[in-house]
Amino acid sequence: MASLPIFDSVSRFLPLTNEDEQFWWRLTGQHMARMMHEAGYPEDRQVECLLFHRFKVVPCLGPRPHSDIPWYKSRVGGGAADGCPINYSWRFGTADRKPHIRNFIEPLGTLTNTPADRLNEVATKALLQDYAMTLPNVDLELFWTFAPHYRPRIIEKADMEKLAGASLLVGAEMSPDSRTIDIKAYMYPRVPSQTSQLLTTILPQAMRDAYGEDVCLDSLNLVRDFMTSDPQGSQLTLTGTTGIDCCKLQDTRVKIYVITRNTSFDHISAIMTLGGRRPISKELLSQLQTLWYELKGAPAELPSSEQLPAQTKPDGSKNPIVVPFYFDIQPRLALPDVKAYIDVSTSPVSDLAAAKAVVRHLEHHGSGQNPQAYLNVLQDITPVEELETQKGALAFYSVAVKKNELDITSYFNPQVYKRYFAHEVQLNGQRRSAFE
């Protein structure tokens, strides 16, 4: 793989810090550098984003690994992840847009995983406040208004211990032709009753508090009605996860995440079109169906009304397939956008085969700029033989419809803990990490 001269030049003049930060910088800094290099980011933008990553992300990743077992299992990356507090996304380019790179982190601090911070909120809120003070485009008005509505009101100690875990994540998008870093926050209600009240009580009140009593809730109400009255929409289940943009109030979006266990493509297309309310051409739906079947290892001739074949775990039990979506709510728009997530972490298709299927799709339809660059990134982060034979590098592909084409994003993991001993073996059997 080609060298990374910009990463090397930036690293040369960085001050020495503790071994934890040195570890995370050498590992994740190189990952970020590789992604920007392959995506064709301008050199000055690469330097800017690398410095942001070093000083505004790396210090929040906590202690470096000392075994293959995480001291705190982060929920970043979902079921495919190994507990590492960071993962990445690569939004494929279009004919007129370069790929966009993001990372997602669960900030870890001195109070993480202690009784003082059961929901791991302290480090995240401190990081968001720091971003608001140093990034001129970051505005936390919506976040600070929404956060109290999502925080559980738990009194009993046993309940708090049972529901402890991540309640906040942070995403940072580094567009190639921008001078800003766009920040997103993700909130996770920990109490099941909160999730059931999300569309009827929590979100309407939070949006009125944020935007004013006269805020237009047409888009939110459409989602609620679709999930209540539509035969297809009523099969959706709220996860409780809500994403918001940390920017000026008039530009913010609220993303509501749901899942379905119906895997027929007729059902998937009905959700993408909101039961016909969002027109999507037959050509694009056909493209999505082909990609859906290929990534899920389903035969191409499977009728669109049929469920995907059940997937079997190594122990012989069945692995249920869950399909996530999100609805993109904006008060100024009456109709929400919809995005589907294709989980490849449990698919019978290997990570490398899945990645190549997406690249073939993009090349066949003339989408994206140099999609092969994405394969270079994956093969730099994870050896080819592991991409061919093991799972865990890839988490999801998301698919939306933008400007009459499929807008595809890949979410993938650095596998810091899972590959810990593999690196030791590579160093001639020495009992230390290859990252040391």
Swiss-Prot record:
It comes from the Eukaryota. Keywords: Transferase. Pathway: Secondary metabolite biosynthesis. Transmembrane segments: none annotated. Its EC number is 2.5.1.-. GO terms for biological process: alkaloid metabolic process. It is an enzyme of class 2 (transferase). The keyword Lyase does not apply. One of its GO terms (molecular function) is prenyltransferase activity. Prenyltransferase; part of the gene cluster that mediates the biosynthesis of neosartoricin B, a prenylated anthracenone that probably exhibits T-cell antiproliferative activity, suggestive of a physiological role as an immunosuppressive agent. The non-reducing polyketide synthase nscA probably synthesizes and cyclizes the decaketide backbone. The hydrolase nscB then mediates the product release through hydrolysis followed by spontaneous decarboxylation. The prenyltransferase nscD catalyzes the addition of the dimethylallyl group to the aromatic C5. PANTHER family: INDOLE PRENYLTRANSFERASE TDIB-RELATED, PRENYLTRANSFERASE ASQH1-RELATED. Belongs to the tryptophan dimethylallyltransferase family. This is Prenyltransferase nscD. It comes from Arthroderma gypseum (strain ATCC MYA-4604 / CBS 118893) (Microsporum gypseum). The gene is nscD.
